[in-house]
Each structure stands twice: as C-alpha cells, then as structure tokens.
C-alpha cells in the first residue's frame, strides 16, 4: 500500500470519528482549548506519523514516527516548567538506485519552557532547547550536540488559538568530522474550534526551518499546511486525533514536496 493510500484510508476513519460528537462535550471544552496551547499544564503524549513524499534523488517516501511527551511541573505557585521532547524513528530511503533503506532513531530534542502558572488568555514561555545526537546512523541525524534559546507565546480564546514557538540551536560538541549545526525552527499556529462542536477544529501550523550553514537556495523550508482534528474519548481516556497535509513552497532540492501527517495525542488532565 502506498503512503498516499494509507493516509487516505486513515483519514476516512478519522472523518468517521469526526462525524460523531465527543461524549460529555461540556466536560472537554477546556481540553479542546488546551490541546493547542503549548504552555497548558496538561500532561500529554503525542505520536506523529509523517509520510514525506518524493524525498531524495530517487523521489521516494521517507517515513517518520515522532514520539513527543509533554510534561509540566509546578515551580512554586506562580510558575510552571513545561518540558517538550521529540524522539524520532526514521525510515530513510537510499540515495542511489538499488541502495538499501536506513531505519532507526534520529536525533532527539528536549526543550524546557518557564511560563507563568496563572496566565489565562495570553501565555508565554522562555527556556533552553537541546539537540542530542541519538541517531543510530549518519543518514538519520547530524551527529552533533547543539543547544540554544527557545521562546513562544500564544493567545487562547473561545474559538481561536493563535501563537508561535521559535528556537535556534548551535552545535558545541559531537563528531568533529560532521558539519557544524546552526539552524532555526519557527512554528506559527492558528487554530479554530467550531462553534457548533468545540471539540472539532481546523489548524494551520507549519514548521518553518532555516539551515544557516546552507547556501541560499538550500537554506529554507517553508510549508503551507491545513489540518483537521477532533477531541475524542476511548472509555475514560481523552485523546486528540488529527490529519494534516503540508506542501513545501520553498525547500532544499532533496527535500519532500508533500508531507501527509496523522497524529494521536493522549491527554492526562490533572
């Protein structure tokens, strides 16, 4: 089955779920707002599957599963520390005809944001981000320890959530034979929760990156994106389901042009 067919079938299942309102919607209204607030005091576990179409010189599909735990901690009564981590597993196509695939973990990322605990509609966070060279193969990571500042802000309304996260990392240790790292990641977000069903939403949330070490034409990746999601319950377990598509308007020559993404996010409200 091709990634596009797999994505289509999963999207049909998701749309069937979207047709059924979440039970006890009045109990989940705050959860529906919190799932798109990166600084909400909401422990959760996100699992993303990305099919990056037409990747590399052979124009094959790269498969990526990202596991992203989000764990908040109280720092006294006035502050929260929100930790956001990314642990990827990558299936990377070969670069030459007939060459084998490379599969394994990629480089991990860990960020920690200090954020006001009592903020309601406007929330911000500041902290460090660290890239850890956990990739099992050179093709799956950069081989460098890298770190830098991270920041974000978000406005949370009844129907709209608008905000952004940004970080830049510089390499400071690692494999000396690998190129130095200096890269930007910018994640704007606009999410609209439907009035008729606040547990259902549309979202625009591209991940824009810049590799400052690359030449001008290879530096930027700028996608446009649209996603649809629904807050659901499996028994007592609340979860968020989302399907998204990304098109890279600007990209390096070997990067994918389309990304199809499926997400399940398990929520553990305190």
Label every PLM stretch briefly:
Residues 1-11:
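Bacterial N-terminal signal peptides that target proteins for export
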Residues 5, 14-15, 98:
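Intrinsically disordered, low-complexity repeat segments enriched in small/polar residues
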Residues 9-19:
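Bacterial N-terminal signal peptides
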Residues 25-270:
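Transmembrane beta-barrel domains of Gram-negative outer membranes and organellar outer membranes
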């Amino acid at each position: 089955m091709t990634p596009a067919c797999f994505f289509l079938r999963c999207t049909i299942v998701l749309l069937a779920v979207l047709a059924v309102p979440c039970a006890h919607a009045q109990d989940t209204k705050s959860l529906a707002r919190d799932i798109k607030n990166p600084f909400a005091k909401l422990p959760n576990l996100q699992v993303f599957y990305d099919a990056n179409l037409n990747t590399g010189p052979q124009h094959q599909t790269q498969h990526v599963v990202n596991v992203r735990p989000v764990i908040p901690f109280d720092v006294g009564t006035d502050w929260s520390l929100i930790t956001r981590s990314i642990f990827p597993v990558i299936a990377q196509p070969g670069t030459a005809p007939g060459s084998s695939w490379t599969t394994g973990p990629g480089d991990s990322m860990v960020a920690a944001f200090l954020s006001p605990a009592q903020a309601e509609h406007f929330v911000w966070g500041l902290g460090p981000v660290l890239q850890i060279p956990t990739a099992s193969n050179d093709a799956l990571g950069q081989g460098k320890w890298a770190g830098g500042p991270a920041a974000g802000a978000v406005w949370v309304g009844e129907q709209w959530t608008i905000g952004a996260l940004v970080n830049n990392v510089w390499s400071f240790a690692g494999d000396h034979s690998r190129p130095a790292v200096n890269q930007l990641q910018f994640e704007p977000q606009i999410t609209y929760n439907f009035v008729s069903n606040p547990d259902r939403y549309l979202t625009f949330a591209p991940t824009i990156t810049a590799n400052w070490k690359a030449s001008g034409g290879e530096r930027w990746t700028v996608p446009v994106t649209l996603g649809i999601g629904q807050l659901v319950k499996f028994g007592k377990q609340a979860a968020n389901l989302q399907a998204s598509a990304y098109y890279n308007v600007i990209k390096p020559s070997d990067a994918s042009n389309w990304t199809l993404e499926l997400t399940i996010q398990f929520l553990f409200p305190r």
